Amino acid sequence: MRLHTMMTRFALLALLAIPLVANASPSHMKIAADNEPGQRIMINGRVFGSDGKPHGVVEIYAYHTDAQGLYRRDRSKGSARLGGTLVTASDGSYSIDTIKPAPYPNRDIPAHIHIRLRGPGINQQDEIRFEGNGPTICHLIQNRCNVDFRLR
């Protein structure tokens, strides 16, 4: 009986030590909850090194405005409410499930998602834009787009 009690306590402690995360994979993040107002989008892509080869295990921090163009900061975290962090897979791939951000109200700046790439020797800021031309433009096709990043 005593061994059974010890094993039960061990199993319970082991279960409590498992982090409870909403993301199925560290290379995927869900920024906006299902009930967040706005157009749902999925962004997939890869991170490449300056040599053009896939670069894995890069931290991506992303944040953006809501469907009204406002950040509405989460005071408890001191950061944008719609934001999060992921780590790219070994092949550099990542995916972000969120809503399409709106442009800032009364400003002539296209809707965009702020991106920070970090890792050993890496500290790069970028953005995903929803208008214009360039390598990090999100051209939505059926609410999906592909955006790759090249490290500088």
Task: Set out the residue ranges of the language-model regions.
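Bacterial N-terminal signal peptides
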Residues: F10-P19
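Bacterial N-terminal signal peptides that target proteins for export
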Residues: R2-A11
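Beta-strand-dominated extracellular/periplasmic modules and repeats
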Residues: S25-R152
